[in-house]
Amino acid sequence: MDIRAAEISAILKDQIKNFGKEAEVSEVGQVLSVGDGIARVYGLDNVQAGEMVEFPGGIRGMALNLESDNVGVVIFGSDRDIKEGDTVKRTGAIVDVPVGPELLGRVVDALGNPIDGKGPINATRRSRVDIKAPGIIPRKSVHEPMSTGLKAIDALIPVGRGQRELVIGDRQTGKTAILLDAFLNQKAIHDNGPEGEKLYCVYVAIGQKRSTVAQFVKVLEERGALKYSIIVAATASDPAPMQYLAPFAGCAMGEYFRDNGMHALIGYDDLSKQAVSYRQMSLLLRRPPGREAYPGDVFYLHSRLLERAAKMNDDMGAGSLTALPVIETQGNDVSAFIPTNVISITDGQIFLETDLFYQGIRPAVNVGLSVSRVGSAAQIKAMKQVAGSIKGELAQYREMAAFAQFGSDLDAATQRLLNRGARLTELLKQPQFSPLKTEEQVAVIFAGVNGYLDKLPVASVGKFEQGFLSYLRSEGSAILDAIRTEKAISDDTRGKLTAALDSFAKSFS
């Protein structure tokens, strides 16, 4: 056998040349103690605040407390499989989630993983969950309406694109129903509206029952509204860090639309539960407690989240992110810590009351206490024309109704005011899942403020409204089109609307 030294040395040299020098260096630490979803880790000296770290078995966590001798890590998932002495690896990445149109129609958890069984999400972009809100220069004041389809809100407490409007009330007063109707109301624009008007919806469920979230998704799906919505769910059985993270994750998904010149609406349901889970994490991390045992930065938790909802100026693409945070009160106590915090952060609030709900006034909006700090800037001119007087009349009605309980002999003017107020209150009622287009709301409220309901018994107001709307849709669609395109009630339209009301009122009686 002939051994050629030159050939062998050539092969060896070749192999040496191709020898890989890459060795993966990862910074690791050791678990000192673990319990209640919190791990104390030794090592990881260069870890960043908010960085994702990895435990054995693929469980992830987020470094929140950076102390002199250890790192406090909150665990996204079960801590049962983590034990003392386990190796913890740095990922080098701050917590981020997938964003983009690929998420529309899907249900994801707080880290953006799909939980609806419809396969993986092929999103190409990712975004950090906790980024700084836009400054003052890139913003523009709110001036376009964000129609919810609810007469009581669109007429009296209008919400604009880029606004933060708080929905606050006790349990079972219809807070989620308002969010759901606002989502369903966008269907008409998505089906045949211009691209620039479309409003994409993000619903963040925090600490709710899985059955409740499933019901919400089912309603959206049945009514064709899931295709433009993203659902982020951190349910009651999920660990506290997931419930804390979910609103930030949903916000990052909504910001994608805002920053690309589109419009998005995000509902946080509800932020009281996020504050509770943040309190749990903070106390377990041994941060000092403050009022009601919440940590000192619970105001900052909500303010940095809600400040990210904004209307951008034209140079930034003129997109917007509108936020509808929900807060649940205990026994109508709006002066508790978290409710007062969020009221002071938002641009107005919609108060829902149990008493009104049980009186059959639904949506149970207390029109006297609810405000929108953007106001009529977020309404089209037609709505301003009819809704301006309804506010004043309802305010007078509430004042008179309080006095009328004592006096029996009322003069004719007071009696007229009370009658009108009762009928307008009846007019603002609306069944669930039946949002109205803005032009239809305008027509109905026009009838109310111009005295067409005054002669009707209060019980027939709803029937009159339904009848008049179907009459307009069949006979007077030109009137509705005129209000929609002109965005105002011209003298010509006013004449036609009055004529239509006269002819319908004759046939109705």
Swiss-Prot record:
InterPro entries, alphabetically?
Answer: ATP_synth_asu-like_sf, ATP_synth_asu_C, ATP_synth_asu_C_sf, ATP_synth_F1_a_nt-bd_dom, ATP_synth_F1_asu, ATPase_a/bsu_AS, ATPase_F1/V1/A1_a/bsu_N, ATPase_F1/V1/A1_a/bsu_N_sf
The alphabetized UniProt keywords are: ATP synthesis, ATP-binding, Cell inner membrane, Cell membrane, CF(1), Hydrogen ion transport, Ion transport, Membrane, Nucleotide-binding, Translocase, Transport
* Entry keyword Translocase: yes
Q: EC number(s) of the enzyme?
A: 7.1.2.2
Question: What CDD domains does UniProt report for this protein, alphabetically?
Answer: ATP-synt_F1_alpha_C, ATP-synt_F1_alpha_N, F1-ATPase_alpha_CD
Q: Where does ATP bind?
A: 169-176
Which cellular components does GO assign to this protein? plasma membrane; proton-transporting ATP synthase complex
Q: How does it sit in the membrane?
A: Peripheral membrane protein
Family annotation (Pfam families):
ATP-synt_ab (PF00006), ATP-synt_ab_C (PF00306), ATP-synt_ab_N (PF02874)
Q: Please give the Gene Ontology molecular function terms for this protein.
A: ADP binding; ATP binding; proton-transporting ATP synthase activity, rotational mechanism
Site-annotated residues for Required for activity = 370
Q: Where in the cell is it found?
A: Cell inner membrane
Enzyme class, top EC level, equals translocase
Catalyzed reactions: ATP + H2O + 4 H(+)(in) = ADP + phosphate + 5 H(+)(out)
Q: Which family does it belong to?
A: Belongs to the ATPase alpha/beta chains family.
The record's function comment reads: Produces ATP from ADP in the presence of a proton gradient across the membrane. The alpha chain is a regulatory subunit.
How is the quaternary structure described?
F-type ATPases have 2 components, CF(1) - the catalytic core - and CF(0) - the membrane proton channel. CF(1) has five subunits: alpha(3), beta(3), gamma(1), delta(1), epsilon(1). CF(0) has three main subunits: a(1), b(2) and c(9-12). The alpha and beta chains form an alternating ring which encloses part of the gamma chain. CF(1) is attached to CF(0) by a central stalk formed by the gamma and epsilon chains, while a peripheral stalk is formed by the delta and b chains.
In Swiss-Prot or TrEMBL terms, this protein is called ATP synthase subunit alpha
Task: Give the organism, scientific name.
Answer: Rhizobium johnstonii (strain DSM 114642 / LMG 32736 / 3841) (Rhizobium leguminosarum bv. viciae)
